[in-house]
Amino acid sequence: MMRSHYCGQLNESLEGQEITLCGWVHRRRDHGGVIFLDIRDREGMAQVVFDPDRADSFAAADRVRSEYVVKVVGKVRARPAGAVNANMASGAIEVLGYELEVLNESETPPFPLNEYSDVGEETRLRYRFIDLRRPEMAEKLRLRSRITTSIRRYLDDSGFLDVETPILTRATPEGARDYLVPSRTHPGSFFALPQSPQLFKQLLMVAGFDRYYQIAKCFRDEDLRADRQPEFTQIDIETSFLNEEDIIGLTEKMVRQLFKEVLDLEFGDFPHMTFEEAMRRYGSDKPDLRNPLELVDVADQLTGVEFKVFSGPANDPKGRVAALRVPGAASMARSQIDDYTKFVSIYGAKGLAYIKVNERAKGPEGLQSPIVKFIPEDNLNVILDRVGAVDGDIVFFGADKFKIVSEALGALRIKIGNDLKLHTCEWAPMWVVDFPMFEENDDGSFTALHHPFTAPKCTPEELEANPATALSRAYDMVLNGTELGGGSIRIHRKEMQQAVFRLLGIAEDEQQEKFGFLLDALKYGAPPHGGLAFGLDRLVMLMAGAQSIREVIAFPKTQSAADVMTQAPGVVDAKALRELHIRLREQPKAE
């Protein structure tokens, strides 16, 4: 081996020992004839000192520059009094260098590794192999490795089998666009990259494997956001002969153990909340419980007011009027209220009414608002009592269709909580349960809220009679307002699966064409089964305190789904296209 130790392994116990290090020159300093090199490797940093009385090694140290790859032989010694660096794990010791060998030189990097904050993300991604040398970036990938190791160990110990499922499969409707791969041997036909291993893991349950897991690559051709990538990694889990409570308990224990092992954090039991309660109280099916603000329904107090903005939705069975109290924010400037009004318009809200509570004891005169005059005093007092308003508070109102009000005020709740730093704790895990089976579209058709293979809490006959009110056996784990994982008990009877397909408008011939293999499998003794999939990238992002999943993926794509380092996607030559039986209608433009 070329090295005896990693830099991060050096400590006082090695004092007096000769060691060999290999790594990169992170920093070089010349102090009065003595040269200091900070050597960096995967495990950390070590300071190496070269004295002029060792002429060869001193001359070599004088020639090296940042990011040279070097091998150093020297003796560990305690640092002089006053020279201890508390910011380095090895800051109490240093290495007196005897030999220095340059293994490779380096050009000046495109950006300094010590001053990276002003470097644009595209530049960092173009030179990702340089960006990943920064200790904070390397630590994120080390954390990712520790997380996957902990999860694998837990699942292995719990009797799960790690089974790989195909990457080249067929397109199935799962909610997003597929990445398609043309087949050379089957002209005109295409494989699809999997959006998830959903159907294959269900087939493994039919095959009797009982407990399956996989750290699986998944692909979705969709618009990108801070927490989305065209290719992402899923912790995929499926098990037979367990109900939803069993699966929730098993995976919750896994996450609790993970946080204890990796971050030394102890979680208690995760609270459970129904989808309906989450939407009513927080305006979201993934509420951030660190934020104490809540939505409160007040429509019953506004059905008879002349102000149509309120009375219209208050009398509409599909409408909602809700209030959001912000404690101590009555001094909020009008410009800030205008900014929040513009913000909720993103979610379809037509405005944002408010009441500033200055002195409640004075009645309406103690309230500052353009809407107070439209609400009878008795109703106004009921509303203020219901939301818990006291002097110094501001109360915002939303009135529209239920979905618009919930999403707009739910997003406003999160924004105000962040703006005013209202979080009451650092971590808030929870479960959301009892999701609707379907979302009803404007034309009366239905879309599966999770996916078409989720089992309902009713019989096929009851489901087809009342699809709009049917609940599913689905469950989501939420952490700090981010969906960590979603799962469900699956349909394991053919009759139920066909009933769901019919409600989704999938005709029988299309069922056979796209899902015939699944329907066949359900005829041959499919066991009751269910599972859950966690987004590994999101989980690592949260545990690392990163702002984007791009920070915790070694080689991520940009917001436009491109790899600026390898220049992918790229143009394919004409011969390759002919072999795939593909002709381009328009030639790609040179960039």
Curated annotation (Swiss-Prot):
Residue positions binding L-aspartate: E174, R220, H450, R490
Site entry: Important for tRNA non-discrimination: H31, G82
SUPFAM superfamilies: Class II aaRS and biotin synthetases, GAD domain-like, Nucleic acid-binding proteins
Segments of this protein annotated with the region Aspartate: 198-201
Principal location class: cytoplasm
Keywords linked to the UniProt accession: Aminoacyl-tRNA synthetase, ATP-binding, Cytoplasm, Ligase, Nucleotide-binding, Protein biosynthesis
GO CC aspect terms: cytoplasm
A Pfam family that the UniProt record links to this protein: tRNA_anti-codon
PROSITE patterns: AA_TRNA_LIGASE_II
Subcellular location(s) per record: Cytoplasm
Catalytic reaction equation(s): tRNA(Asx) + L-aspartate + ATP = L-aspartyl-tRNA(Asx) + AMP + diphosphate
Residue sites binding ATP per the record: R220, D221, E222, Q229, E483, G535, L536, D537, R538
Top-level lineage group: Bacteria
InterPro entries referenced in this protein's UniProt entry, alphabetically: Aa-tRNA-synt_II, aa-tRNA-synth_II, aa-tRNA-synth_II/BPL/LPL, Asp-tRNA-ligase_1, Asp-tRNA-ligase_1_N, Asp/Asn-tRNA-synth_IIb, AspRS_core, GAD-like_sf
Family: Belongs to the class-II aminoacyl-tRNA synthetase family. Type 1 subfamily.
Record's protein name: Aspartate--tRNA(Asp/Asn) ligase
Naturally occurring in which organism (per UniProt): Pseudomonas savastanoi pv. phaseolicola (strain 1448A / Race 6) (Pseudomonas syringae pv. phaseolicola (strain 1448A / Race 6))
Name of the gene this protein is made from: aspS
